[in-house]
Amino acid sequence: KEKNKIKAQTETQTESRAEAQENEYVWKNGHPTEEEVLCQSSCMGFFRLFNNLRKQRGIKLEQLVNGVMTRRMLSTIIKGDGYFSRECWEFLMHRMGALTDYFEAIVSRKELEDWREREDICLLVCESPKEARTKLEAYEKAHPKMTSMAKLFCLKIEWLLKKETASPQVLYELACEAVYCTVKEEWQGQLSGLWLAPAELEAILLVSWSLGLLGETEKALFLFHQVWNYPKKKGWEDRMTQLLCPQAALVGMQL
């Protein structure tokens, strides 16, 4: 019941996040700016790479974009009336276990500034949590209608900042809410049937950690092993697996 409540609460915010993403990357008044034309050109090149890899691996497009992009937004991109953000394209490639380090991308100034703001928050979480909290709150205030990927980031940071003070139940609910930002399918059982990026698996690791704090050791270990074995089952590239190993090892030590 508690899990369904958390899922329902998260789903009520999904439409506004989807709308935020659509409004961000669709031409205003039907006329792209010069910057948008450059981003769109880069995006279509990435979309072809993404589509070719997806077809090689026999993955349905709807499966990969579920929870990240609406059908309407996907249709808009295919028609050439909008474009992938770098974050979105990278997220979807990561769901296939494919690195994106090999490709250069053109990103908008706004997206670059957004990335820098998040990087600043990450650098402060461990060494200066109070300052990280201040920057996180400022970021959330500046982005009232953020995308599902941005919300996933914020909730994971929130969990880390509350780890020492919040109750295990609060941490569990927070971690579940983070997962539900982008994962719409059932995920507390077998993960092998889902297409998940490292960012999503990190959130599931936080759920596992929270379950351990709640004394639900068996459930915690089950979920942990699902995440630990996921890259191998999905045939991830070695360097992709390295993006997840340190976090998984840390949670494993806590359990």
Give the positions of each predicted feature:
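Short alpha-helical DNA-recognition segment
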Residues: 56-76
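A short, Lys/Arg-rich alpha-helix, primarily the initiator
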Residues: 21-57
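Tandem amphipathic alpha-helical repeat scaffolds
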Residues: 115-126, 152-167, 199-215, 243-254
